[in-house]
Amino acid sequence: MPNFFIDRPIFAWVIAIIIMLAGGLAILKLPVAQYPTIAPPAVTISASYPGADAKTVQDTVTQVIEQNMNGIDNLMYMSSNSDSTGTVQITLTFESGTDADIAQVQVQNKLQLAMPLLPQEVQQQGVSVEKSSSSFLMVVGVINTDGTMTQEDISDYVAANMKDAISRTSGVGDVQLFGSQYAMRIWMNPNELNKFQLTPVDVITAIKAQNAQVAAGQLGGTPPVKGQQLNASIIAQTRLTSTEEFGKILLKVNQDGSRVLLRDVAKIELGGENYDIIAEFNGQPASGLGIKLATGANALDTAAAIRAELAKMEPFFPSGLKIVYPYDTTPFVKISIHEVVKTLVEAIILVFLVMYLFLQNFRATLIPTIAVPVVLLGTFAVLAAFGFSINTLTMFGMVLAIGLLVDDAIVVVENVERVMAEEGLPPKEATRKSMGQIQGALVGIAMVLSAVFVPMAFFGGSTGAIYRQFSITIVSAMALSVLVALILTPALCATMLKPIAKGDHGEGKKGFFGWFNRMFEKSTHHYTDSVGGILRSTGRYLVLYLIIVVGMAYLFVRLPSSFLPDEDQGVFMTMVQLPAGATQERTQKVLNEVTHYYLTKEKNNVESVFAVNGFGFAGRGQNTGIAFVSLKDWADRPGEENKVEAITMRATRAFSQIKDAMVFAFNLPAIVELGTATGFDFELIDQAGLGHEKLTQARNQLLAEAAKHPDMLTSVRPNGLEDTPQFKIDIDQEKAQALGVSINDINTTLGAAWGGSYVNDFIDRGRVKKVYVMSEAKYRMLPDDIGDWYVRAADGQMVPFSAFSSSRWEYGSPRLERYNGLPSMEILGQAAPGKSTGEAMELMEQLASKLPTGVGYDWTGMSYQERLSGNQAPSLYAISLIVVFLCLAALYESWSIPFSVMLVVPLGVIGALLAATFRGLTNDVYFQVGLLTTIGLSAKNAILIVEFAKDLMDKEGKGLIEATLDAVRMRLRPILMTSLAFILGVMPLVISTGAGSGAQNAVGTGVMGGMVTATVLAIFFVPVFFVVVRRRFSRKNEDIEHSHTVDHH
């Protein structure tokens, strides 16, 4: 094939241009993302039971729905939480690769079976099924700058004019409103009701009857009488629209003709639909929307669409209303992609300089450089064909590929120049001869490197999704690189290179290059002599090799594991939790302290704080809160002390001084779709039906044990709410029936007075809003207030609650969790500084194994994926090595020669392990990819030597030692050149700082360390391996091998 293109260089150019055009068009169409869809798809079911406590919600809603979620395809795990605000959320997580739309349809179908079994109040509120991630893509804040709007006004405007439009935006999965829209609030006075012999049941019945839309039909409607001349709609009663109209609702007409109106027994106002959440932006009243990404949606496109939608609304905002973005994960995505692109450009420049140093000829250097855009653009075309995106992982693959893809072109150019210098042939003839020598090596290297990376593409789970990005990118680049080296590079060499006089190795050049060539030639002679000496005493070097292998094994076992490195994403969160029973007012004081700390003590780093009272990922309640903290640009906060990890550690230390509250600042996970916080995510499960109390005791025991290991664990905390005092009212049904009181009336009165009852809807400024009936605040603050409420008996007498009920205090949970259909408690935590999540997880497993019988555990979220990736890694290494061996065996038509190549692998691996250990990195997914790259590159250097030595023996009849020494002499320059090019190519990854540097350091460090040792050690050990293997498996002993040599050329 090379000879064909040497004679037809324009044909070669045409192919290269077509590849580049395809890549250019692909770049224009490829989506941009931080990561591909790594997180397994999730579907969330949300329901509400107004006024119900957590236990009631769990028993009547959560379990009913869970028990119907059987037989759904690819379901991985299911978690749920039920809280005392009457809210339930059930999240079903599916295996990676599952179609989220089909999963949603299946869940919806199963939910329909459960719907008739749910309480009427729940059905009335509606049950939603959304395919969205568990974490927020962004938080949009809305503030009033001129003080003309209250927080309730802002919230109502956001709910009425913004929430629905954002919910409809493509890519949005779910929208959480921080606040509530207006509702018609009927605040009942029990004393006035009793005075007029009325009950909440009477109030609700009257509102339903008098606030109704009546469809009254038409005058002259069809079928009309003959000759009808008029047709008109009849408008009768319509829904009420104002507090005055509601005040005039008639409750009762007395015998004397006097009337009792709603305003006589209740205070009526436009108020919040609920008062559970209070939001502030930098200390001033605000409202906002927490936006979650739909499963599989593109974060950058969705965020851009949201901003565009909001920009369209802004001209119509009331005076003083302003949008802020206190939490947005997408700037990090943009800048991290930008940083990797910058790294890619730096790598190309460094590789060019290395090539120029060795080739010392602009034309010769230009030939491998031309290969770079051809291969990179071609790789983009392949990515588009596979449906991939331009993301951090594919770009890392490109950076790793830079060093690999110029290798082939360098090998071609260097060998052509060597042939011209040694034999004095003209460029065209030298290229023909050169390609005959190295064509087999090029194909062999391509096969081996592909063999290393192809198995990655077949692994499952989130780890498999990450592996696939690297695999397809690097294998595509490698395949294109070999094609370019066989098609375009020979054509360029034949047409662009100038003839070199026979025997001219550049020693005669002046200046730096002359000195470099002389020194290199001298070093080559010394190196060849050293190898000759080593080959005379191979035994001691094999012992040294065994020591290296043992050291590698030791380092590998000792290297701590994790899933992905943490990143400074420019935003983080702070969780606030007060003791059980704490009020909203107390929580607000703590949130004010948190906000003040960030805006004063960290003012050089913090841009804004959006504090939300009553909301948290651990549950909702008056004693919970969360603060979304946005940091200034990465360029404005240089230094490790201004990174998010340092800021959160300082903040958590400072917040530990706050009495009566638990406050944690925490960073986001590397992949936000896999959770809300860094560290581990642990589920403690009641496997034996021990009950809530026993499970709580087990959880507290585990937390106490974890606290004894501050050297390994930090911030270990329950992701839930502590049990709180609950006021239990027991209804004596026998007494109630004896008094002639309806149980239904008792339940309605209790729910309406203390929990609030949704009655129906009204029209407010053209929008349908809800009507709620509830006791006025001052009549539901104390336990004794229950005695103010009456129920009408069958004989018309008013019976107080005290006549048929008793009350007591007991403890109960405001938030109940379940995991895979069993009661559970979620525990979050982090590894102590200097320790990995893998080590922390192992310790947690040890501590959990000592818990009482019947208490089990499981990992969820990012920790589940980490366990999965750790279990897959050994299989990945083993399969890759086996496939490499088989490819080499096929290439050399020998079972023995591949051993001389395979034995070099530990020499690269030990370098990767040393580099990671000295830098304090972990055995994460990026390191695993780097390790595989190191395996491939180590084998590549060995192939360059082994291929030449074997050819010299088979074709020129040279002896084993002579052929080996000639091979190492001839291949030293290209090995050093390609290795140095690769090392400097990944150097920008190693020294990267700022956005995305965690991932870049993780990828680059191991590969660079591995390449250094693979090069320095391999050039001495590969000759030893080749000689030892050839002696051990000589032809006469290789009965199972073929007796002929296959000519690769």
Curated annotation (Swiss-Prot):
UniProt KW keywords: Cell inner membrane, Cell membrane, Membrane, Transmembrane, Transmembrane helix, Transport
One Gene Ontology CC term in the entry: efflux pump complex
Residue ranges, Cytoplasmic side: 1-9, 357-365, 414-438, 491-538, 889-898, 944-972, 1019-1049
Phenotype when the gene is knocked out: Loss of susceptibility to contact-dependent growth inhibition (CDI); inhibiting cells still contact the target.
GO molecular function, one term: efflux transmembrane transporter activity
Result of changing residue 526 to Y: Partially restores chloramphenicol resistance to an AcrZ G30R mutant
UniProt subcellular location: Cell inner membrane
UniProt similarity note: Belongs to the resistance-nodulation-cell division (RND) (TC 2.A.6) family.
Entry protein name: Multidrug efflux pump subunit AcrB
Native species: Escherichia coli (strain K12)
Gene that produces this protein: acrB
